[in-house]
């Protein structure tokens, strides 16, 4: 008996998912990746705001950071989720590997005891790569799981809690940090006052773990498409050459030009152009479409952190942590003492000799 084919047989196959439940899983992975980027963005905003409060010359930048636009934040989250959902797993893996190689090269080129601003710049420009890494990691860890959608929903719930907590922290700090830190009665604000300079180190360790897992997942996702070792060699050889040339070019550009939004846009265009030319020879046409979505996602992330990029351009910002000697000297010059400390007793004046 004649029967019409199903609707899915007429639809083209899309990268990294099939129609049906796989589309829902890809949407969940993209949303989790976007929420992870939102958490990083909120923590960076807290760090930069506290640094602006501690620097009296940065009042205009502080007012710019404290301006909250919830609708724009939700729009940014929705757009990033869309781009991370549409990008294929193959291109997402390539984006993660390219950024990891560039980050390792940058960190190795820094001198010992320096490079705090360079690390902050890496935190700013890694946002789309972090979203791709989280999506790749989830795709690799949940591959073949019997309850994949349920596991992703649980991961989404955890990501939502973390994102809401980070956003609440940002609103609290931007509105009440100056009052609470001066009157010393809020534990959160006092904790940031004491440990603000340790936030970059904490973020660095967290991102190192995240990208280490993402790199392993990216290599596994790329290698599973090859049927033989010769195909893998034909893909990895030009990829290694392309990435090496890109890293050398990025290092030269970094030393010759200062960090700016325009420079980062040019860097994104060069990176995506290199990947586009590479995938024209060893990739598929759907990979080329994913490169376009990746380009839009990178530009979308840069548009959301314009204020933070402008702060990184300021010479001497963020201020370095004061040393113990400087703090003691400042305390001695101000003449301030703790009211709970016992004050040294002043010697009594000597009695004058009374003539007999």
From Swiss-Prot:
Has keyword Transcription? no
Where this protein primarily resides, as one coarse class? membrane
Listed under GO cellular component are: membrane
The record gives the membrane topology as: Multi-pass membrane protein
Top-level taxonomic group: Eukaryota
List every stretch annotated Disordered: 331-356
Q: Where are the transmembrane segments?
A: 31-51, 77-97, 120-140, 144-164, 202-222, 232-250, 263-283, 285-305
Q: Which UniProt keywords apply?
A: Membrane, Transmembrane, Transmembrane helix
What is the annotated localization of this protein? Membrane
Q: Name one Pfam family in it.
A: TMEM82
Regarding protein family, the annotation reads: Belongs to the TMEM82 family.
Record-given protein name = Transmembrane protein 82
The coding gene here is Tmem82
């Amino acid at each position: 008996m004649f029967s019409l084919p199903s609707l899915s047989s007429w639809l083209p196959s899309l990268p990294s998912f099939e129609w049906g439940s796989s589309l829902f899983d890809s949407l969940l992975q993209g949303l989790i990746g976007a929420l992870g980027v939102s958490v990083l963005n909120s923590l960076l905003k807290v760090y930069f705001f506290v640094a602006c409060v501690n620097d009296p010359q940065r009042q205009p930048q502080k007012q710019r950071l404290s301006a909250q636009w919830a609708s724009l934040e939700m729009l940014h989250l929705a757009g990033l989720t869309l781009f991370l959902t549409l990008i294929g797993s193959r291109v997402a893996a390539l984006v993660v590997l390219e950024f990891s190689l560039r980050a390792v090269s940058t960190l190795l080129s820094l001198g010992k005891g320096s490079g705090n601003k360079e690390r902050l710049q890496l935190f700013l420009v890694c946002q789309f790569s972090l979203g791709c890494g989280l999506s790749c990691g989830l795709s690799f860890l949940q591959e073949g799981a019997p309850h994949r959608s349920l596991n992703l929903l649980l991961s989404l719930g955890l990501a939502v809690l973390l994102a809401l907590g980070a956003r609440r922290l940002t609103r609290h700090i931007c509105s009440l940090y100056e009052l609470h830190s001066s009157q010393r009665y809020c534990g959160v604000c006092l904790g940031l006052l004491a440990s603000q300079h340790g936030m970059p180190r904490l973020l660095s360790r967290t991102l190192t773990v995240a990208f280490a897992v993402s790199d392993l997942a990216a290599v596994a996702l790329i290698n599973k498409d090859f049927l033989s070792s010769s195909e893998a060699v034909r893909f990895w050889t030009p990829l290694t050459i392309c990435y090496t040339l890109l890293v050398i070019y990025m290092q030269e550009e970094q030393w010759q030009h200062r960090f700016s939004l325009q420079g980062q846009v040019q860097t994104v265009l060069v990176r995506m152009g290199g990947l586009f030319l590479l995938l024209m020879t060893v990739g598929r046409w759907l990979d080329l479409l994913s490169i376009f979505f990746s380009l839009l996602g990178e530009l979308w992330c840069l548009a959301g952190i314009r204020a933070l990029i402008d702060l990184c351009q300021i010479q001497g910002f963020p201020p370095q942590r004061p040393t113990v000697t400087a703090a003691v000297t400042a305390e001695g010059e101000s003449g301030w003492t703790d009211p709970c400390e016992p004050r040294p007793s002043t010697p009594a004046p000597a009695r004058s000799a009374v003539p007999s």
